C-alpha cells in the first residue's frame, strides 16, 4: 500500500473518549490505515511510553504513525511522521532536524495550503469540514471550502472535523485522499465495529 493510500482512513486519539493504546489497537483491527497520537495535556514521559506502544501496533498492522506537534516525541518513538498546525514548529525546521519524517500540515484556506506546500509538507489536513466537539476553536470550512482546497492542492488532502458515518460519503466525494476521524471511532462503544463500518464506506470511494 502506498503512502497516499495509507492516508485514506486516519484515526486520531483523544483521551476524553478512550485510552490511546486501546483505541488505536481496536481501530487498527477495524481497518484504520493511519494513526495520530494527540495528547495535548500529557507530560513528555507519558507521551513517549504511550507512543512506543502505538509504534509497535502500527508496525504490526502496517499502518502509518504520526505524532501531533511534538518533534521530540516523534523522534523518540520513531514515528513515521509528525502533524503540525500553522502556529507550531515550522515545516522547514522539521525538515532540517528530521528529514526522514513525513510531514502533515493543517490548512484552513488557500494561503495556508500554499505556505505548507512551499515549505515542503507531504500531505494536508484540511478542515474543520463540520463543527466538532473535539476542537471547539476550530474554524468551520464546509464542503465547498474542502472541495476548493482539494482541487487546488498538489498534495494529498485528508479531510478532518466532525466526520462520521452519516456524512463521510459526501466528504469523500470532494476529491480527498482520506478522512481523519476522532469521536466517530475512538468515542464509539464498539471501536472495531465502528472502524469496520467506516472502512467499508471509504473503500467504495477511495
Swiss-Prot record:
SUPFAM superfamilies: Thiamin phosphate synthase. One of its GO terms (molecular function) is magnesium ion binding. Its cofactor is Mg(2+). GO terms for biological process: thiamine biosynthetic process; thiamine diphosphate biosynthetic process. 2-[(2R,5Z)-2-carboxy-4-methylthiazol-5(2H)-ylidene]ethyl phosphate binds at residues 132-134, 162, 182-183. It is an enzyme of class 2 (transferase). It holds the Pfam family TMP-TENI. Its EC number is 2.5.1.3. It catalyses: 2-[(2R,5Z)-2-carboxy-4-methylthiazol-5(2H)-ylidene]ethyl phosphate + 4-amino-2-methyl-5-(diphosphooxymethyl)pyrimidine + 2 H(+) = thiamine phosphate + CO2 + diphosphate; 2-(2-carboxy-4-methylthiazol-5-yl)ethyl phosphate + 4-amino-2-methyl-5-(diphosphooxymethyl)pyrimidine + 2 H(+) = thiamine phosphate + CO2 + diphosphate; 4-methyl-5-(2-phosphooxyethyl)-thiazole + 4-amino-2-methyl-5-(diphosphooxymethyl)pyrimidine + H(+) = thiamine phosphate + diphosphate. InterPro entries: Aldolase_TIM, ThiamineP_synth_sf, ThiamineP_synth_TenI, TMP_synthase. It comes from the Archaea. Keywords: Magnesium, Metal-binding, Thiamine biosynthesis, Transferase. Binds 1 Mg(2+) ion per subunit. GO terms for cellular component: cytoplasm. 4-amino-2-methyl-5-(diphosphooxymethyl)pyrimidine binds at residues 36-40, 68, 106, 135. Belongs to the thiamine-phosphate synthase family. HAMAP family: TMP_synthase (MF_00097). Condenses 4-methyl-5-(beta-hydroxyethyl)thiazole monophosphate (THZ-P) and 2-methyl-4-amino-5-hydroxymethyl pyrimidine pyrophosphate (HMP-PP) to form thiamine monophosphate (TMP). This is Thiamine-phosphate synthase. It comes from Methanococcus vannielii (strain ATCC 35089 / DSM 1224 / JCM 13029 / OCM 148 / SB). The gene is thiE.
Amino acid at each position: 500500500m502506498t503512502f497516499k493510500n495509507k492516508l485514506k482512513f486516519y484515526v486520531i486519539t483523544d483521551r476524553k473518549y478512550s485510552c490511546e493504546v486501546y483505541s488505536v489497537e481496536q481501530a487498527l483491527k477495524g481497518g484504520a490505515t493511519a494513526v495520530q497520537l494527540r495528547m495535548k495535556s500529557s507530560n513528555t514521559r507519558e507521551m513517549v511510553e504511550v507512543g512506543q506502544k502505538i509504534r509497535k501496533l502500527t508496525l504490526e498492522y502496517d499502518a502509518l504513525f504520526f505524532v501531533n506537534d511534538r518533534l521530540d516525541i516523534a523522534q523518540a518513538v520513531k514515528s513515521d511522521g509528525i502533524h503540525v498546525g500553522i502556529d507550531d514548529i515550522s515545516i522547514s525546521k522539521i525538515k532540517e532536524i528530521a528529514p526522514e519524517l513525513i510531514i502533515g500540515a493543517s490548512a484552513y484556506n488557500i494561503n495556508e495550503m500554499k505556505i505548507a506546500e512551499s515549505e515542503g509538507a507531504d500531505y494536508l489536513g484540511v478542515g474543520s469540514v463540520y463543527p466538532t466537539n473535539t476542537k471547539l476553536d476550530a474554524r468551520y470550512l464546509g464542503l465547498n471550502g474542502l472541495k476548493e482546497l482539494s482541487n487546488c492542492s498538489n498534495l494529498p488532502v485528508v479531510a478532518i472535523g466532525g466526520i462520521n458515518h452519516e456524512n463521510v460519503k459526501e466528504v469523500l466525494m470532494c476529491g480527498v485522499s482520506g478522512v481523519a476521524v476522532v469521536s466517530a471511532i475512538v468515542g464509539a462503544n464498539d471501536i472495531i465495529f465502528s472502524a469496520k463500518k467506516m472502512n467499508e464506506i471509504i473503500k467504495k470511494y477511495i
